[in-house]
Amino acid sequence: MAAGCSEAPRPAAASDGSLVGQAGVLPCLELPTYAAACALVNSRYSCLVAGPHQRHIALSPRYLNRKRTGIREQLDAELLRYSESLLGVPIAYDNIKVVGELGDIYDDQGHIHLNIEADFVIFCPEPGQKLMGIVNKVSSSHIGCLVHGCFNASIPKPEQLSAEQWQTMEINMGDELEFEVFRLDSDAAGVFCIRGKLNITSLQFKRSEVSEEVTENGTEEAAKKPKKKKKKKDPETYEVDSGTTKLADDADDTPMEESALQNTNNANGIWEEEPKKKKKKKKHQEVQDQDPVFQGSDSSGYQSDHKKKKKKRKHSEEAEFTPPLKCSPKRKGKSNFL
């Protein structure tokens, strides 16, 4: 293990990752610092664990005067690679301590064996757990995500979705995507890779929420419009109807009052300035006192003005003819008396 650890290649730095990203094979990988990695531990679906661990290191004789540098080189070479002793993938470390005062040399091996202790942040996902990634690639066959800025995750197109449905999904570059861990792989160089799986139900739920919001907004607008119209129309129709009824009542009352005034004025020959109701009452009383027999009414009980005029004319004619009848017997009486 000591020889393997010493000869293991160093992980790609940020500059190397940019070259790989330009080729289109892998996105740009950036190793987080220990402080940044500790900040990600408490995030949702991080699958990160922080804690102290001990490691066995075979240090080359050239690092006898630079032990810390040699230890860091070996630990850096193991970052982003699965470690059986750590049961995960280390992404950052700090606070290195050498356990014991002296190292050990076994037989004729030239390396010095040391035990160290350091604080590690380990990425240890398991199949079935959920992760959050940033979308950095969208194609017709899969979606590429970057988890914690350093792990590449590939999410293939689900078999249940057709090509049209896959293209119409609202997933863009830079979006945060939630997925489920399906399988954990590593390439020939030992770089850790994640195979993910989309949750179709969550995607359909998002679509249904959007459609429900659209339908609810449409129904609310459709429900509000007729209500406003009804509120506007009802008072208008009511006001118009009430206005017409009032006008009709006034129109019916005015000709009756005018005709009654004209009849009373023609009969008496005098224009009076008394209220209209009093004139009507006086007319009815005079007609009833003078000639109650000739009062006519319609089937509805309403007394017509035309009949009143006829009655008054007959009454006036009788009044004109009555004086000569009264005078003639007086003259005859006088002649007979003589």
From Swiss-Prot:
Matches recorded under Pfam families: RPA43_OB (PF17875), SHS2_Rpb7-N (PF03876)
Modified residues (Phosphoserine): 242, 304, 316, 328
GO cellular component: nucleoplasm; RNA polymerase I complex
Positions in coiled-coil regions: none
Alphabetical UniProt keywords: DNA-directed RNA polymerase, Nucleus, Phosphoprotein, Transcription
InterPro entries linked to this entry: RNA_pol_Rpb7-like_N_sf, RNAP_I_Rpa43_N, RPA43_OB, Rpb7-like, Rpb7-like_N
One annotated GO biological process: cellular response to leukemia inhibitory factor
Tissue specificity as recorded in UniProt: Widely expressed. Expressed in all fetal and adult tissues tested, with highest expression in fetal lung, liver, and kidney, and low expression in all adult tissues.
Residues covered by region (Disordered): 209-338
Phosphothreonine: modified positions: 322
Subcellular location: Nucleus, Nucleolus
Comp. bias intervals (Basic residues): 328-338
Subunit structure: Component of the RNA polymerase I (Pol I) complex consisting of 13 subunits: a ten-subunit catalytic core composed of POLR1A/RPA1, POLR1B/RPA2, POLR1C/RPAC1, POLR1D/RPAC2, POLR1H/RPA12, POLR2E/RPABC1, POLR2F/RPABC2, POLR2H/RPABC3, POLR2K/RPABC4 and POLR2L/RPABC5; a mobile stalk subunit POLR1F/RPA43 protruding from the core and additional subunits homologous to general transcription factors POLR1E/RPA49 and POLR1G/RPA34. Interacts with RRN3/TIF-IA.
Family, as annotated: Belongs to the eukaryotic RPA43 RNA polymerase subunit family.
Job description of the protein: Component of RNA polymerase I (Pol I), a DNA-dependent RNA polymerase which synthesizes ribosomal RNA precursors using the four ribonucleoside triphosphates as substrates. Through its association with RRN3/TIF-IA may be involved in recruitment of Pol I to rDNA promoters.
Protein known as: DNA-directed RNA polymerase I subunit RPA43
Native source organism of the sequence: Homo sapiens
Lineage per the UniProt record: Eukaryota, Metazoa, Chordata, Craniata, Vertebrata
